[in-house]
Amino acid sequence: MFKNLIHCFSIKEDIKNFKEDLIKECINQRKEEEGGCNFKVQTKYMDTLYKIFIDCAKKILKPFTIKDKNFKVWCYMTDSMYNDTGWHNHKKSATINSVIYLQIQGKGISFKQGNEQIYFKPNNEDMLIFPASLDHNPEPSTKDKRISLNLELLCNESEKEIFNV
């Protein structure tokens, strides 16, 4: 059921020169407030991250054109203080979704479609690409910082066309 929906790439070589700086940007920009797990990050690496995302997506998906190039990078960071999570999707803001795992702490992510559910355990420096409408639930860390980034593409084509499902 999840075939052709979830794609995993190791981007270790692509981000090795700036990964630690990117983690520092995330930690420094985290808002100390309730629900501080998700926040928008202003990063000098945004163009590079989106280039990696788009290049990988073009390798495995059907041709697509980007409708909105007003790109954003969101950070999901959990630890002993902030570890809220829940099922969600990105269908209101995107067509293609990507998660980049910077510091995973051995935690994974669950995906759900209809009555089917799978659990996936990515590695540090992995990037997942999947349809924005696919429900998912990240596994939070309740100790050390778990840091991942969310990137989205809003396309002119439908998910069905792009993911060939």
Language model regions located:
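Non-heme Fe(II)/2-oxoglutarate
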Residues: 1-68, 84
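Catalytic core of non-heme Fe(II) oxygenases with the double-stranded beta-helix
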Residues: 68-140, 144-149, 154-163
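C-terminal end-of-chain micro-motif
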Residues: 1, 164-165
